[in-house]
Amino acid sequence: MKIKAPVITIDGPSGSGKGTVAGLLARKLGWCLLDSGALYRLLAFAARNHGVDLTNEEALKLLAAHLDVQFEATAAGQGQRIILEGEDVTHAIRNEQVGSGASQVASLPAVRDALLLRQRAFQEEPGLVADGRDMGTVVFPDAPLKIFLTASAEERARRRYLQLKAKGDDVSLSSLLDEICARDERDTQRAVAPLKPAHDAIQLDSTELSIEQVLERILSEIALRGIAG
């Protein structure tokens, strides 16, 4: 029987830094990267492009099964480009409206089922770093290392505010905090695959930690468990 490539999962709420940490970790290890949140953002983005209502579960399920999407590594390992139906949407799917839509469609059981096998297909040699909200609980429950990364809602809103201001966006810190709290409630209260730590996950609060400190903590766990060579 073929031994599957190892997986490290990094779950957590919006703005916890999981995407940044996962990208840095994947590059450090030379592993594949799954940004599962991007799949839900892509679905919400495609739904709006095709006039599909975000409450129409059957139509969204069909759209999810036939998403024409590619993830392409950029030069020198600087992240990835996301191509949807031939168009580079890497930045277009990162706005707050698409993020809110992603949270909506992620609460639909049929949509999650449609994307499950698609996510598991990313598990390839030499290994996979997967970030999202249910990577350790649902998608890769047998992963040898599971991280649940969090931070206070206020700190997560502050980080997002600084990101958006740096891009020149006109945003309000208070409105971002409201949106993060609303997303937290949707993600933790949904009936299917709610946001929660896996029973065997290592929980890290990054409120007062730098990205580098979080990465070092995870690398220490990898070394301790002998996961990456």
From Swiss-Prot:
Entry GO MF terms: ATP binding; CMP kinase activity; dCMP kinase activity
Keyword Kinase carried by entry: yes
CDD domains, per the entry: CMPK
Biological process annotations from GO: nucleobase-containing small molecule interconversion; pyrimidine nucleotide metabolic process
UniProt-annotated binding residues for ATP: 12-20
Major subcellular location class: cytoplasm
GO cellular component, one term: cytosol
Record-linked Pfam families: Cytidylate_kin
EC number(s) reported in the record: 2.7.4.25
EC main group: transferase
Catalytic activity: CMP + ATP = CDP + ADP; dCMP + ATP = dCDP + ADP
Keyword Transmembrane helix: no
Keywords associated with the record: ATP-binding, Cytoplasm, Kinase, Nucleotide-binding, Transferase
Matches recorded under InterPro entries: Cytidylate_kin, Cytidylate_kinase_dom, P-loop_NTPase
Localization: Cytoplasm
Similarity comment: Belongs to the cytidylate kinase family. Type 1 subfamily.
Protein name per Swiss-Prot or TrEMBL: Cytidylate kinase
Origin species: Pseudomonas savastanoi pv. phaseolicola (strain 1448A / Race 6) (Pseudomonas syringae pv. phaseolicola (strain 1448A / Race 6))
Lineage, opening ranks: Bacteria, Pseudomonadati, Pseudomonadota, Gammaproteobacteria, Pseudomonadales
Gene: cmk
